[in-house]
């Protein structure tokens, strides 16, 4: 569970989104732990529509939490392959995944009743001054 309200940056999902293989990447702009912008073709338009639909059906207190960065993880299984199977995709070695939406099962405050996961094939992941993953290679090296 990412620390709520703390994540900032750009996430480019280029593997699969919610178990669907992507032909073009979907870009999420995250500020203070919330997705504030989505771009990248027809799949991103579908995602925006889905999130708008969720916003119209949740409690008023949860509307701002629909875009919560709910999960972030790394794939570590060298035998897994990107296939469109959501559970396998998120564990491919060198990949990373994010989930947006509900994080209540992990103790978070976003209770919006849905979660969408996206997989990045060869990401670069930085945490302050440490490169955790460089172009899909697990490094955990200080810059």
Locate the predicted segments by residue.
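Metal/cofactor-centered catalytic core regions of large enzymes
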Residues: 1-143
